[in-house]
């Protein structure tokens, strides 16, 4: 269910914001270390000179300039104040609102924290005391005030055209009742009611002032990143402002900053440069450089632990034996994309998927066998290609997308056949293979085309890694193979999440869940297969090959970029997808076929909201023909 926060009164403004602020109490989810002396102090788009003390509480300062000679106490709200050099004290419960009127004027509206702004002036409180008493102290005749029947309609707020008069009349209205100059300004000025101020406010001037103050604030918030919300804010919006107004980028973060923070920082810098309207080629190049740095840092975070533990491959089969690895593919039906770094690193992921064979056979297969010569032979049955590798340099050329043997090269490297991954040191690949006892022949077979959305690339990588683990005596279990597949995809710079490999490594239908952090090892909750296998439902599922393929890398890069930037709509969508996966889990657990089908349809809608290219016209033309026949459908992946 939802929650309701009321912002109707000054007290509710503060209490509601305090409640919203305290929704999250888990310090692990709050990246910054706040230094507010009291939690009920809120400052936004403001230039604030005085320092807060333990005595300050229930303070709201927004779109305002508060100078060094101001004194705030408790229960103060300050809004709209332009730059000034006033000496001003706000007693407990006193508030100031300055509203731009017309092209060059302002309405000066002091009020009390608990003022209700309704009732006849003879019987209403203003600035925390009876209005009649306030007026008498200043020599004001109640009967001379227009709209005296109701404080909201009473014309008591002066309109001024300079900040000097504004400060003087404020002092007079707030506390210095004998200040003759203040009274003179009030009497000579045109005066408006609270109702009229709301109707006549120049919102463009108000927003312009807020923008200027925010542009001053942003560099300070960035500089104070350890104690501010900067890197937890919507960095897409912040970067847009940096670019639009040509704000200088903050200083580089220190190496001591967390890896995730440094990664978000690099992507923020990239986006800010992309948004610069006058940056030209130089900004474009800088944007690419920062984006590459962000993905490099992400790779570092995901691979450091796996690369720290080096391997010592040892031949574990006889000369006439073959290691045969086979794997199903996977279809995700809810929660896909929530397994993708950096989102899953920050919030964890939930995915419901199922492992499937085609025509009763695992469609991905790998054969590894010894060969007499000290080299590595790579073959692909389905592509009709082969390659012989004789040097470390040839083996390390694995990070080219589209290369037919990128996956086995990277897998062999991770298995310890490149120096950086091996415990022992050799002068050449030939020397290492002679010490190993033989050369290696790796043969691949994929009965499913790449780009089908069934996790083919990830699961082929898992199959190769699993076969090499058995062949080389590495002893990797399924969890380790899944994690090393994630590492392998980072080495190939294709990116991607963990659901593909675990979807096929682990059998059947299941909910996979991870917690936040770089250690993405999913917990598995298996589901009954009745809705897919019982005769009543078996024929109700169809896997249809459209013949339309897409490489995941370009799609991933754009979505991951928005994840790094905490882009509001995307994060909201991903959180909904996480919750949706739990709904799907519940529907399958309850054997509710109709609900499951409709939830598959919802998954399809969610995927389209996340990636507009998910449903190209050719696919939409196909699905329109079956809309009235299906509870739900989706493209896998």
Regions inferred by a protein language model and the residue ranges of each:
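Short pre-catalytic strand/loop immediately N-terminal to key active-site residues, enriched for Gly-Thr
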Residues: 448-452, 631-633
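Left-handed beta-helix
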Residues: 1-278
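C-terminal nucleotide
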Residues: 175-179, 183-434, 483-493, 501-635
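DPxDG-like acidic metal-binding loop motif
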Residues: 452-474
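Short, conserved phosphate/pyrophosphate- and ester-handling motifs at nucleotide-, phospho-/glycolipid
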Residues: 9, 457, 637
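Catalytic-loop motifs flanking and including active-site residues across diverse enzymes
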Residues: 12, 403-410, 456, 460-464, ...
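Glycine/charged-rich beta-loop-alpha catalytic/anionic-binding loops adjacent to active sites
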Residues: 389-396, 438-450
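Contiguous, small/hydrophobic- and glycine-enriched helical/loop subdomains that border
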Residues: 470-488
């Amino acid at each position: 269910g939802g929650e309701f926060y009321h912002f109707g009164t000054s007290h509710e403004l503060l209490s509601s914001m305090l409640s919203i602020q305290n929704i999250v109490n888990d310090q692990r989810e709050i990246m910054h270390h706040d230094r507010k002396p009291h939690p009920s102090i809120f400052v936004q788009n403001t230039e604030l000179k005085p320092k807060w003390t333990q005595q300050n509480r229930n303070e709201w300062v927004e779109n305002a300039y508060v100078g060094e000679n101001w004194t705030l106490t408790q229960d103060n709200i300050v809004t709209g104040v332009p730059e000034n050099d006033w000496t001003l004290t706000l007693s407990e419960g006193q508030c100031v609102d300055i509203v731009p009127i017309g092209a060059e004027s302002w309405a000066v509206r002091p009020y009390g924290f608990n003022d209700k702004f309704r009732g006849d002036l003879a019987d209403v409180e203003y600035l925390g005391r009876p209005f009649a008493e306030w007026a008498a102290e200043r020599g004001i005749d109640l009967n001379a005030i227009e709209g005296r029947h109701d404080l909201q309609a009473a014309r008591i707020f002066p309109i001024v055209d300079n900040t000097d008069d504004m400060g003087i009349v404020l002092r007079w209205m707030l506390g210095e009742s004998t200040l003759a100059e203040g009274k003179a300004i009030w009497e000579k000025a045109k005066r408006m009611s609270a109702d009229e101020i709301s109707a006549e406010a120049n919102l463009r001037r108000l927003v312009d002032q807020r923008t200027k103050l925010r542009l001053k604030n942003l560099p300070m918030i960035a500089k104070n990143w350890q104690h501010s919300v900067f890197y937890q804010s919507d960095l897409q919006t912040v970067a847009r402002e940096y670019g639009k107004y040509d704000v200088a980028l903050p200083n580089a973060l220190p190496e001591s900053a967390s890896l995730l923070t440094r990664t978000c920082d690099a992507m923020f810098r990239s986006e800010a440069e992309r948004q610069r309207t006058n940056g030209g080629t130089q900004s474009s190049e800088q944007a690419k450089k920062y984006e590459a740095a962000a993905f490099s840092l992400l790779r570092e975070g995901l691979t450091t632990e796996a690369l720290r533990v080096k391997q010592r491959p040892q031949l574990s089969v006889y000369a006439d034996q073959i290691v045969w690895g086979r794997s199903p593919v996977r279809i995700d039906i809810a929660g896909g994309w929530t397994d993708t770094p950096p989102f899953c690193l920050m919030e964890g992921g939930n995915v419901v998927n199922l492992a499937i064979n085609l025509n009763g056979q695992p469609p991905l297969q790998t054969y590894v066998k010894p060969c007499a010569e000290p080299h590595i032979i790579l073959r692909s049955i389905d592509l009709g290609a082969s390659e012989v590798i004789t040097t470390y340099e040839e083996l390390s050329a694995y990070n080219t997308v589209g290369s037919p043997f990128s996956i086995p090269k990277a897998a062999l490297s991770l298995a310890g056949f490149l120096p950086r991954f091996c415990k022992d040191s050799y002068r050449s690949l030939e020397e290492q293979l002679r010490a190993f006892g033989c050369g290696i022949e790796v043969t691949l077979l994929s009965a499913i085309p790449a780009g089908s959305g069934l996790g083919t690339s990830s699961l082929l990588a898992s199959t190769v890694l699993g076969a090499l683990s058995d062949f080389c005596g590495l002893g990797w279990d399924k969890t380790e193979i899944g994690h090393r597949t994630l590492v392998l995809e980072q080495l190939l710079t294709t990116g991607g999440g963990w659901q593909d490999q675990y979807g096929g490594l682990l059998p059947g239908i299941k909910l996979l869940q991870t917690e936040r952090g770089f250690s993405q090892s999913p917990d598995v909750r298996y589901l009954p297969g009745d809705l897919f296998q019982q005769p009543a439902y078996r024929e109700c599922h169809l896997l249809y090959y459209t013949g339309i393929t897409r490489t995941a890398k370009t799609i991933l890069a754009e979505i991951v970029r928005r994840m790094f930037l905490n882009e509001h709509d995307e994060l909201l969508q991903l959180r909904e997808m996480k919750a949706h996966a739990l709904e799907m889990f519940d529907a399958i657990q309850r054997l509710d076929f109709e609900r499951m089908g409709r939830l598959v349809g919802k998954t399809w809608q969610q995927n389209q909201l996340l990636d507009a290219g998910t449903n190209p016209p050719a696919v939409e033309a196909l699905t329109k023909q079956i809309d009235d026949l299906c509870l739900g459908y989706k493209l896998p992946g």
